[in-house]
Amino acid sequence: MAPGRKRGANKAMAIGEMRLGDLVLAKVKGFPAWPAKIGQPEDWNQAPDPKKHFVQFYGTGEIGFVTPPDIQPFTSETKKKLSARCQGKTVKYFSQAVEEISAAFEESQKQKSDIVGNEALLNAVEPSVTKPKYLNQASSDGKSDKFSSRADPCLGKLVENNGAEINPDVGEQDSSISNNRNTSPSSEPVEHGSPDPILKVAVDDKIDNVTCTDHSDGTGNNLVNDQRIIRKTTDDSNKRCKDEVRAKRVPDSRAATDNHILGPNQKLKGSIKGQDHGSKKGQDHGCRKESSDSKVVTDLNIASSKKPKELLKEKKKRFENELGKSASGADESKRAAKRPRSEDAKDQKQCKSKRLVPVGEGKAEISDSTGVVSIFKREIVLGISALGGKNQFDKDMVAYTKRRKQTVEHTSVSSFPGSLVKEGANHPEQKISSSSDSDIKVQAAQLPKRRRAVCIYDDDDDDEDPKTPVHGGLSNIPIASTDAPKSANASHNTSIKAKLLAGSTDSVKTGKVPLYKHNKDASLALPDSVEGYNSRMGKPFKALLQKNIKPILRSPKNSYQLVSFKKQVTGQNKTAKVAGAGMPDSVEGPSNSSYMGKPVIKLPPQNVKQTLRSPKKSPQLFSTKELVAVQNKIAKVSGAGIPKKYHGDSSKDVVAGSDRVSSSHSQTANQRSKPAFGEKPTSTPKVATRLDVEVSRDTFVNLSADVIDVNQENGNAPLFSFGMSDSSSSCMKDLIAAAQAKRKQAHSQFSPFVNLDHNSLNIDSMQTSKSPFMVQNVSSPAADATLIVAQEHQEVLTPSNHGRQSSSSNQAGTEENEERRFSSGHRSVGGSLSGATEAAISRDTFEGMIETLSRTKESIRRATRVAIDCAKYGIANEVVELLIRKLEIEPHFPRKVDLFFLLDSIIQSSHSQKGRARSLYIPTVQAALPRLLGAAAPPGTGARENRHQCRKVLRLWLKRKIFPDFLLRRYIGDLGASGDDKTVGFSLRRPSRSERAVDDPLRDMEGMLVDEYGSNANFQLPGYLASLTFGDDEEEDLPSTSQEVKNTHMEVKITHMEEPVLALGKLEAHDSSSDKPHCVVDVNGGLEMEDASCQLKDDVCGIEAKEDSPATTCATELPSFPAGSPPLPHESPPSPPPQPPSSPPPPSSPPQLAPAPPPSDHCLPPPTAPLAPAQSIALPPSSITRPSMPSHPSLPLQPGFAPPAYPLLQHEYQISMQRDHSSIATSNQIAPVPVNAAHGRHADGGVKSEYLMPQSSSFAPVGMCSYGEPLPFISSKQLEYGNSDVLFKQEASSQNQQLRPINTSFLQRPMIRNLAPAPSSHFPLPCRIVQSEPQRSSFPHPYHFPSQPVDGRQHMNEEWRMPPNGCSADPQYGAWIGVRNPFPGSRTVTDGVFQPPPERPPSGTVRYQLAANNLQGGSTISGNIASQMLLSRPDVPSAAQYRPS
């Protein structure tokens, strides 16, 4: 049983039957059948739906997809019904819609009447020219008549003569064209509210030669009076006639000149004599038969005034000449013709509307370029301007007004030899072009043979990659629509001569490949030499284009359809492809083989449309791919309207940049100065400006020096390196490399980031010229390479910047400008189709991330990923330059560190990868490392933290062997040798872990091998890591000599922890600068490594301190304080609590510091006083030799303490000790040594083993942790009060100091910033000292303080107990003696036993009451064990006990 019929199936029109621009009634749910016309979804950025028709509704201007069953054709009957219905109450806008569609329908009907003449022409054409197949197609198109009638008076009916014979080649092309058109989104329906698409038939048919009878005098046949000679040069293809086919005169000259009257000189290649709109596609195709490949030249001598014979003669002559020229393109034409045939069927089905294509060499080329080109939009848009009569003109006017939105003057296009103007059949452009042609009234004789009338058909722009609305929107192409009325009138008189540049290799090239294919990205191919052309109106072609351009912009749909100029220079392969409509960059002269200076950026029509609508979104304007390697000289111009050069008078119009790139600067300037067409020099710039502003803002064609390295001599070189296909990616890299090299030269002198060459841009000229495109490369090729298309750039760049900008004086402003230019310019490089576009996007993204970078792993990771992506596009050098420039201009040091961390992350990530990222970033950064370090870690005290972080990163690189060791070591040494660490105040020390910001990537890195950024996190044993990796960090904060013990790995091997006393020599401290043994010396509270071979002994010798002897056994002299060290505080600390009665009076004068030699094992220097040797404290050898302060380099300043300078050298420290009236006794035993903590030097947290005393004579141990191994605290030396290093010189009494520790406390607090609040008298001793007990002669208890790993960070918050008589089992964790006030819960050591400290020990808690004046100064405390006591301030009484809060 047969299936039931679909409801409405009988009314439904098959999609294949519907043509673009057909008038229909579309039923939408909730509304009556609404007047609409078939449109192209691509014009509206809509994806085509194969099962539905895309319609544009009249009245509301809305669009939608409607199923075929819901669509019925709009006919006379339907019109009557709707009119009657409108008499009553109707839905809002319905009446208006009916009126609009009725008007469109009437126009189409008029066109049908005109098309009759075209049928006659088609019939006149030899059958070989037209094939019945096409006739059939035309008949199928017959349905489209209503469409054409509605959409285009000329086109709509052009094809009505279905029976007319159509040139088989043309027919095929037409069909293919129609298919393509259907496919192409640019079909006229896109127009809002314009019921009539401009000749849609032409678009659909893509018939180059199809002419609308509308333009005919109105009789429809008058134009035919002129004989149209069609010479069909067929390559030996079966499809095409091999012999030239001369079309017999077609009584209907109108048909021949449907689009525009063809003067005797005019040749319609693709046009078929019988271009019958009635025949529609068939005829149109027939007309197109001439399609470029076939090189059929149909000379429609339509000028009514001229006799057909005369016209024929003239045309013959011209044609023969042209044929000779175009002979070379014959083969290509064949191919093109073949393609169109296959496509025609599809096209006819999909697009009934026919495209009128003006005859011209351009068409032939188009067809040559694979009939597809002609089919799509290559077809020269029918020059509607060639209207046969007044009626035609009136019709054109109407159509024009309706279609005002977009049209490129075909005349202007045609004026370009070999240039193809594509115009949607439904676009008024065709009409306009024809009309403009008539207006131009340039006799065939006037036009050079090369020149040919071109109509731009953009209907297929979407299909064609090359077409880009933005490109189309460029100011270069004037819209013919403005001229349409004029041209319509003149069209009768004027014949448009479409010459085939047969000889031009360009045409051949394009002919071989469909222009669409050639210009996937650029819809326009400008003839290389358009300069000489004048529009029919007598105006420079470009001027016309400029006018048209603006409207195009207004109607983005059509903009991409603007003119696609294929500028063909005979004999030259150069073709400048203009992506935008009508972007002839340089109309200057054949000399400029590529209009635009050769760069034409192509974008797929869809992209173009989008760009027009949202130019900012079109960073893709540049279709990099389409730098057509195929065309040796094709320069891609971005849709953004890369400045084109017009030889025209107006410099404004000229976009010198592109030409300039190709040509010498002077030439460029000249070209710029010239207006594109010599018409309204200002108008073009305005258009360009608009385009630039809209498009270029986001899609500036910023041809940074790096982006474009244009060889001036090679005008043909692609203007944009990024407009390149993969094949040209290497080229782009070369260009970028060259630009960067130049940039580097400019920047070699500390100039920030990428300063384009001084000559790179002449912004002033741009501004003065007012041409948005006027980017003038001042003097250098790099400058040429740099083009800024957008006015925005011009605005951004001030003339001062023009002066450019390398000068350091203008550096900041210049940098900003450059940055702006750089980022925006890269944006301009956008082309979704091209890697260059993606590269530009990635670069811009990276630049944005730099601006918002924070020191968080996530932020750095994101930016790193983008940087790696940039490397994939070959712009790693730009990324590095961006970083350098940002580092150089960044005023805040922490931000510099963030950026350097980002660089580190990029380097580590690229190092871990194989391939391009690694190959690009590593060498690039290596070469730029001096600049990077100079910018990230500048000299000066304020950048100390930066240098520290940079050294850390460099050591990491060294460890991972990312860069050569010698190089990294040199830089590390340079950073370490800056010496400012010694002079920088303690306040600049690196914050402790607890103080770091929560987002600090280094905060939680104890367990990581270092990938702070989370990308390469390798975990190690925390102890090992801490010692190797982070202790280093802390140490760096400590002042260090150039030999700073910041060995890259901080490998301090404390192998002999078991031994209470180890030779310092056993500690292996690998200094970055040298491996010489170092002596750890307490310098104002900071442990410093000093070269002291004498001190490197297996046995730790007691240091004999002599009261008045400044000499030290270490043979170190007491240098004066470093110039940068802060002076000792002059103000006395708050009055200390009263001393215990037994405490000696403050010394009258400070004892001279007697530096203690490295104590030999248990070797006690003879006490100056009878102090019991027990009081000497064994100094752990490790502390003596520890390479540098481990992770405690920085202790927060205690209130009351002057900010300590970074630890000074031992000499300096000793001096300070002298000044503080203290001396250090270095011994293996810990003895109470009062030190005035106020001497800020010791405050450095790095002093792990020193006792920091508050400013009172008493002191608190800063860190009792032996640096190397735990050492028993054995009194190796008596504390000599006067002779001892640290204790106040009491009156020469030989009494043993009576130490009454009241709650001595050892706080295990590495990195404690605050000095122990305990009264300075508090002297936590591991030794048993009873408050009431006089000092013990010795402290037999060996307190083995576990060697402190280089990094004690992990122990920061931990409190370690020291067993009374043993070494700490864990060598990794040294017992740290807290510097802070003992807090509740903290352990205090009393009598060698840890005890919970009092909540806050009173000021006298641990005060050692000096029983005798000669209280033996505490023996020196080993570096980690607080062996070196901070000196008490001289002005503070020795007994004074000051406990800072």
Curated annotation (Swiss-Prot):
Q: Mostly located where? A: nucleus
Consequence of gene disruption: No visible phenotype under normal growth conditions, but the triple mutant plants hulk1, hulk2 and hulk3 show delayed flowering.
Looking at the record, which segments are called Disordered? 133-197, 211-302, 319-356, 409-439, 460-491, 641-685, 797-835, 1110-1203
Residue ranges with Pro residues bias: 1124-1170
PROSITE patterns for this protein: CID, PWWP
Give a yes or no for keyword Kinase in this entry.
no
Q: In which tissues is it expressed?
A: Expressed throughout young primordia, and vegetative and reproductive apices.
Boundaries of every PWWP domain copy: 20-77
Looking at the keywords, is Cytoplasm present?
Answer: no
Provide this UniProt record's keywords sorted from A to Z.
Answer: Developmental protein, Flowering, mRNA processing, Nucleus, Transcription, Transcription regulation
User: Compositional bias of type Basic and acidic residues: which residue ranges?
Assistant: 228-257, 274-293, 331-350
* CDD domains (UniProt xref): PWWP_HULK
Q: Which domain of life is it from?
A: Eukaryota
* Composition bias, Polar residues: 173-187, 211-225, 660-673, 797-814
Q: Quote the InterPro entries the UniProt record gives.
A: CID_dom (IPR006569), ENTH_VHS (IPR008942), PWWP_dom (IPR000313)
Q: Where in the cell is it found?
A: Nucleus
Q: What is this protein's function per UniProt?
A: Probable transcription factor that acts with partial redundancy with HULK2 and HULK3. Plays diverse and essential roles in the control of plant development, physiology and flowering time.
Q: What is this protein called?
A: Protein HUA2-LIKE 1
Instruction: Please name the source species.
Output: Arabidopsis thaliana
